[in-house]
């Protein structure tokens, strides 16, 4: 699901996507939580984290249970064609988990070049406290 249909409800008609309808029809709904892709202007690291926080807040306002969502993070900044630093990704995961998000994913997974480095991101996937 494009994040824009959550943050800008008027775009639901353009994409024919709706978080509440998807959540009612599927066990899980993957949300493209990709701040560097969704915004027209380049974002700083701090702005990207703030954008993710706003996205979670909008999902909570939708009354769709967070455990029915998967927040799919971007591992590449397609604007710069550079990997998102693994430390930034783990910071995003920490932020999302603090907000109650349980299901995390990322794309793309360049396992042949260990990007993002598994030893860095794997511990962040644990929801154990």
Report residues per predicted region.
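Aromatic-lined carbohydrate-binding surfaces of glycoside hydrolases
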Residues: 1-8, 33-37
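Substrate-binding cleft of secreted/luminal carbohydrate-active enzymes
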Residues: 25-42, 48-52, 58, 62-129
């Amino acid at each position: 699901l494009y994040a824009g249909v959550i943050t800008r409800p008027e775009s639901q008609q353009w994409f024919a996507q709706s978080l509440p309808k998807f959540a009612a029809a599927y066990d899980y709904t993957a949300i493209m939580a990709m701040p560097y892709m969704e915004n027209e202007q380049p974002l700083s690291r701090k702005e990207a984290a703030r954008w993710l926080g706003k996205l979670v807040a909008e999902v909570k306002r939708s009354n769709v249970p967070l455990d029915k969502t998967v927040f799919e993070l971007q591992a590449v900044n397609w604007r710069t064609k550079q990997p998102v630093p693994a430390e930034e990704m783990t910071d995003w995961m920490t932020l999302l988990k603090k907000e109650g998000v349980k299901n995390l994913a990322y794309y793309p997974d360049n396992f042949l070049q260990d990007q993002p480095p598994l030893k860095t991101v794997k511990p962040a996937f644990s929801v154990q406290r």
